[in-house]
C-alpha cells in the first residue's frame, strides 16, 4: 500500500479548491464532469440534523405530512436510496428514478437537503439469482444468499459492472438535483461479512500477490514457506486463508486480510469515480472501526468522513473515540455522525437498553462540540418488515410519535443553542494523539497477543482503552491513522502496533527531534512487515532507535509478575519486552517480581529535543490505572501539555477558540448523575455573562459554554 498522509489528503483538497473543481448547473444533464477532480472544499456553515428516509417503503400520500413534521422537529437533511436498487432498476437495464425525483422535489421546496446514497449494499435478485459465483463466500466455503445485504462479491466483474452502471445512472439522473448536498458510498461496508473467498476474489488475490512481490521467490523468502512444506512455485498455488486442519502461516492470514480490505477501499474509489462522471458534490461513507475494510485507505474515496454509532448510555465514550478518529481522518474537513438511534438499537433476536431521558441531546452536543457538522438518526419511521423490526425510530410503524420523539426535539433545541457558538469558534488543535493502524489490526486479528481476562479482545478495543485513559484524565486528544503526519502534536501514543514501518519510524524520529514525546506501547515492534518475528533484534528497527537490547519477549499473563514505574508499583500482564538499556538510555520502569526480575520494562531516550519512551508491558490489576495515569501525566508534562481541568468521570471539556481569539470551553456531562469540575479563576458563562467562580456544577446530561482566560 502506498503511503497515505493527512498532509497529502489535505493538500489534495487544497489543490482542488485552488484549481476550481468543475461545477455544472444543478439539475443539468450536460456532459460529464472531470472524474479526476475531487469535490471542492466545502462546509455547510450550519449544523446538520438529519434522518434516514425510505420513501420506497411507504405510501406517497405520507410524504407531505412527513416533511411538515420534519420541519417541526428541526430536521434539515434526509439521507436516502442506500437500499433501493430494486426500486430504481427492477430488472436489469430498466431504470426508474421517479420515486426519488418526486421526493427530492418536495424536500427542496421545503428547504430540506438530501444525501444521496449508492445502493450497492443490497443488489437486486436479478444480479445474483442463478449466479452463485457472484456471491460472497466465507472461509468455510458457505455462499451467501440474496435476502439480506452484502451478499454479493464486489470482486466479481459482473457485480462491479452492475454497481458502476447504477451509480453512473443515479449520478446522471439525480446527482445535480438542487436538493442534493452530498453522496454516501454504499452503506456500512463489510459490516456483516469479512474476507471474501469466492473464485473471483481468489483470482484477484493472486494478482495482488504478483503486484506486491513481483516474483514468487520473493514471497517464499518473505513468508519463510519452507516451514511445513509451504513452498510455492507460482502465485496461483498460494491458497487463500480458507479453513485448514490447523492454521495457515501467519504471513498468509494477515496478507489475505489486507488484500480483501484494500480491495474494498479501492472499490470505493471506483464508486467515487463513477459518481464524478456527472456530479462534483462531496462524497462520504458511513464507516465504523468494526467494519472489515482498510479504513485509512478508504478515506482516499471520500471528501469528508462520517461514521455510525449505536452506543448505550454506558458506552458514551465510544462517541468521543470515533469523533476523535474520524475528525482527524481527513484534516480540515468536517465529519458527521451519519447514524444513531433515537432510543435504542435493535434487530431480530436482540435489542439494546433504551436511552435515559436527556442522553440523546447530550450525545448530539458532544458530536457537535468535537467538530461534527452532522448528527443523523436511523431512521424516520420504524420498519414494518425486514430484519430490524425492534429498532427505534422517530415515528412508529403506525405513524405516531415514538418514545424517542421528544428526545429528538431536545436535540433540535440543543443544536439551536450551540450553533451560533460553534460557527463562531474552531476546535483547538489536540496536542496528544493515539495511533490507529489498519495493518496492526489485521496482525492482531491473526495473532491475538494478549489473552488475559478483562483485556480487550479486539484491536479497536485496545486503542479505545488508551483513548479513554487520556480522555478521563482531562486531556484534549485525537486518534490519527498510521500514515498521518504528526504535525501539531506534542505527545504520540502508539499502542499494540506489531510492525513499525521504516516510514513511520522516520516520521516519529523527526517528531521526537523537534521536541515531541513518543510512547511506543506493548507489542509495538515485535513483528516484521510480513507478520514474521524479527531476527536482527527483538523489536526490529525500533530497538536501535530506543537504545535498548531486548533480552526476552515473554508472556506475563498469570505469572504474578510486577513492576515499578516512576515510583508506582503494579501487577503486569500480557506480552512483555524485557530490556537492558544502552548508554544514553534511562531505565524508568523495572520488573520487580517474576521472570526477568531486574530487567527494564520501560525506558526513555532523549533524541534531539524530545524523547522516545518504550513501554514494554501493560499494567494489570488493582493499580493498573494508577500506573498508566502516572505514565501519561509524567510524559505529558515533559512534552509541555497541561490538563484542561481535573475532570471527574463522565465530564468532557472541549476547548475551542472564537474568531476574536477568546478561549471557549464546552463542558458536557455525559452521565445522568450530577458532576462538578474545577475551573480557572476567570470563567464566565457565555449565555448569562455571569462569573462562575472556581467550580462548575453540572446536572445530568447537561452542557455549559464558558469563556476562560489564563489557560
Model-derived segments and spans:
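N-terminal export signals
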Residues: 2, 8-30
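N-terminal carbohydrate-binding accessory modules
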Residues: 36-77
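Short, well-ordered coil/turn segments that N-cap beta-strands
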Residues: 45-47, 74-76, 110-114, 176-181, ...
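The substrate-binding groove and active-site-proximal loops of carbohydrate-active enzymes
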Residues: 49-57, 84-98, 145-162, 251-264, ...
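Short, acidic/polar
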Residues: 58-70, 288-296, 356-364
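Aromatic-lined substrate-binding rim segments of carbohydrate-active enzymes
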Residues: 67-68, 80-138, 271-276
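Polysaccharide-binding and catalytic clefts of secreted carbohydrate-active enzymes
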Residues: 144-304, 318-319, 325
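Carbohydrate-binding surfaces of carbohydrate-active enzymes
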Residues: 235-238, 311-711
